[in-house]
Curated annotation (Swiss-Prot):
Annotated transmembrane regions: 29-49
Keyword Cell division: yes
Keyword Transmembrane helix belongs to the record: yes
UniProt cross-references to Pfam families, sorted A to Z: FtsQ_DivIB_C, POTRA_1
Membrane topology: Single-pass type II membrane protein
Name of encoding gene: divIB
UniProt protein name: Cell division protein DivIB
Gene Ontology annotations of biological process type: FtsZ-dependent cytokinesis
């Protein structure tokens, strides 16, 4: 009897086993079909124009042309969109001395938008009859000379790309706008005792003698210093150590007295 019951039990389970195997087979087939469909979709995507970069839009550029920005980005029309890294493209753009900041974003399925912020031109270096942009970053564009300066920005003289120019621009950037707009020219004129000496010609007719390292700290008081001068009085304001004013009249008188003394001494020796 026990053996008969066992045979009957196995026979009853056979349909269930077949049903389980069928479900398992269907599940495996579904997985395989799904993988196959995904592979086909991926293949079709990479074969379609949608997978490739179609358009590179540029905004925020003023000095750089759109084509120059595209070239700096390293992106090329027709390359696979999936391989484009926004971060790496932004880093590539920021290597350009004119670009202060850059953001890259994907638009739609296969377009890229590039937005840049350029360093502003704060003045021009006057050299050999040409003018070279001096940027707010402290860099001078030596490969892009102009015939004439644009607007009423500062004029620089005797500067070269390097730490001295960077320090000078950094000091200027710290000044209030009204003080900067009162400056006409900044001339680098180092002496034996002061390698950071500069001379400024002001729009109001005065001159300023200063040191680059303390320029912003002391030059911010220029309006107050000028306000204390007699009306119409012009001269040289020395802010290297403290603050000292010498009128052009005094300066010329001292120069004349020195020349006369030298002349008398020469005549006496003869």
């Amino acid at each position: 009897m026990a053996e008969n019951k066992r045979v009957i039990s196995i026979e009853n389970r056979i349909p269930e086993l077949k049903k389980y195997r069928k479900k398992k087979l269907v599940r495996h087939l579904a997985i395989l079909i799904g993988i196959f469909v995904i592979l086909i979709a991926i293949t079709l995507y990479f074969l379609s124009p949608l997978s490739k970069l179609d358009k590179i839009a540029v905004s925020g550029n003023k000095q750089l042309t759109e084509n120059e920005v595209r070239k700096e980005s390293g992106l090329e029309i027709g390359e696979f969109v999936i391989g484009i890294s926004n971060g790496k493209t932004e880093d590539a753009l920021k290597k350009n001395t004119l670009i202060k900041d850059a953001t890259v974003s994907k638009e739609g399925l296969n377009d890229v938008q590039i937005n840049i912020t350029e360093f502003k031109t704060i003045g021009y270096q006057q050299q050999d009859g040409k003018y070279y942009d001096v940027l707010e970053s402290g860099i001078m564009l030596t490969d892009q000379p102009r015939q004439f300066p644009i607007g009423n920005d500062l004029l620089f003289q005797n500067f070269k790309n390097g730490k001295t120019l960077e320090k000078m621009v950094d000091q200027i950037n710290k000044l209030p706008k009204d003080v900067v707009s009162s400056i006409s020219e900044v001339i680098y004129s180092p002496t034996k005792s002061d390698k950071n000496h500069i001379k400024l010609y002001m729009n109001d007719g005065n001159q300023v003698s200063a040191d680059i390292s303390t320029f912003a700290e002391k030059m911010q008081h220029y309006p107050a210093i000028v306000a204390q001068l007699a009306k119409g009085q012009k001269g040289v304001i020395d802010i290297e150590v403290g603050s000292y004013f010498q009128s052009y009249y005094q300066q010329n008188a001292e120069k004349k007295a020195t020349e006369e003394a030298a002349k008398e001494k020469k005549e006496t020796n003869e």
